[in-house]
A protein has these predicted regions:
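Short alpha-helical scaffold segments that flank and stabilize functional sites
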Residues: 34, 40-41, 60, 67, ...
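Active-site beta-loop-alpha junctions enriched in small/polar residues
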Residues: 21, 49-51, 77-81, 107-110
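N-terminal binding-site loop/beta-alpha segment at the start of enzyme catalytic domains
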Residues: 1-71
Length: 128
């Protein structure tokens, strides 16, 4: 597996990431096999979002690989634009994923300058 530095974060991530959206389409046992096979092959970048199946993608990842938490970079997303909702999403995401931290949190589906301004403003999601 080939790896790259993740910006200035100090994280080293595999060139092949694993997106969790389609975990919604498969049973838990198959998700466990798929995720563990990806990690066994040297992959270490798992991405999901609270909006994927109302947290079901996160829950499948949490049930499947959290015993291997030190082996991968964990990324999730929130579509919240305000601090309160983003903080609630983060807390729920951590419960779903069965972990105490994310390595990266992405703001999901930011499509306008106005949305970005809201996220970055006082009381915006960035403060969460």
């Amino acid at each position: 597996m080939e790896y790259r530095r993740f910006g200035k974060t100090g994280l080293k991530t595999s060139m092949l990431g694993f997106g969790g959206f389609h975990l919604l389409e498969i049973p838990q046992k198959e998700a466990e096999k798929l995720l563990n096979s990806y990690l066994d092959a040297g992959g270490n970048y798992l991405e999901t979002a609270i909006s994927y199946g109302a947290g079901e993608s996160e829950r499948k990842i949490g049930r499947s690989v959290m015993g291997r938490r030190d082996e991968f970079v964990l990324v999730s997303k929130t579509g919240a634009r305000d601090r309160k909702t983003a903080a609630e999403n983060i807390d729920e995401t951590l419960r779903n994923l069965r972990t105490d931290h994310l390595d990266v949190l992405l703001m999901h589906a930011v499509g306008t300058i106005a949305e970005l301004d809201t996220i970055l403003s006082e009381g915006g999601a960035y403060e969460a």
